[in-house]
Amino acid sequence: MATNFKSLLPVIDISPLVVKCDDANMAEDAGVAEVVGKLDRACRDAGFFYVIGHGISEDFIRKVRVMSHQFFELPYEEKLKIKITPAAGYRGYQRIGLNLTNGKQDMHEAIDCYKEFKQGKHGDIGKVMEGANQWPENPQEYKELMEEYIKLCIDLSRNILRGISLALGGSPYEFEGKMLTDPFWIMRILGYPGVNQENVIGCGAHTDYGLLSLINQDDDKTALQVRDLAGDWIPVIPIPGSFVCNIGDMLKILSNGVYESTLHRVINNSPRYRVCVGFFYETNFDAAVEPLDIFKEKYPGKGTSQVFKRVVYGEHLVHKLQTTFQNLVEHS
């Protein structure tokens, strides 16, 4: 990150990028060029930005949250019917306090979903994540709604990443040649109970470890916070109909450190329950992630001797999961 945060995170209308998303010559379009410039500044300065003009209706985005609220309102015993276990590939419902960040319990519950893959496809590393996503019977049609939402988020993430690739000086498809022939994804449907005291950590400070994250948060509660260069926590105030987008550790590596993944956390000081749906767009599960050649040439360690180690995404993910759900592993 090159500069400090502004008073508000940037709001970027990506509609020109969406219109031209499949045009190999999109970089020549003036509207796309403007969007690309804004993406570049946002990724360098903050690592976080709002996305509007994305083409997904506000009503649909809201319905995803409304039906998620309905699930979390169910009796605990009902939610446990899709309980997360290591045997289920870490897919399903997790109770409040099961998730650990930096070794401390987080005050949230969730449904965790991952891209499904065939048994044996990713060898021993992928074996611990094999299994089908667990969906509740109630609310009805929730599975169908969320599967459609996943498809839309995949398309949106791909479009944003094409703009970022242009911002870094590559072709729109720079990342897609090797790293995204079969992109992995994660979705976390998160519920944060209302609290009667301040500064209860809903989710501890962390960076995301994939490429891009799309955050769909309740419109009427401010809980997500991003840390600036001075060490201050900046509230990410909800904007109806928008997504909050941030870059993750894998994009930091691929870009040769030009873009920095940013620490963020969740503190729900509201007495009301909060829902947030996080979609995480990743590389191929078996991708060996290191700075792409074009970015090593254009940004050789940002003028330093910094070298980013090669990381196999799936190994990185499994290690993070087993650390996050340490209690689950120990008592399984």
Curated annotation (Swiss-Prot):
Tell me how the cofactor is bound: Binds 1 Fe(2+) ion per subunit.
- Keyword Cytoplasm applies: yes
Q: Where Fe cation is bound, by residue?
A: H206, D208, H264
Q: What UniProt keywords are attached to this protein's entry?
A: Cytoplasm, Dioxygenase, Iron, Metal-binding, Oxidoreductase
Q: Which cofactor does it need?
A: Fe(2+)
The disruption phenotype is: Plants missing 2ODDC23.1, 2ODDC23.2 and 2ODDC23.3 produce reduced guanidine content.
Catalytic activities: L-homoarginine + 2-oxoglutarate + O2 = 6-hydroxy-L-homoarginine + succinate + CO2
Give the source's domain of life in one word.
Answer: Eukaryota
Q: Where is the signal peptide?
A: none
Q: What is this protein called?
A: Homoarginine-6-hydroxylase 2-ODD-C23.3
Name the lineage: Eukaryota, Viridiplantae, Streptophyta, Embryophyta, Tracheophyta
Name of the gene this protein is made from: 2ODDC23.3
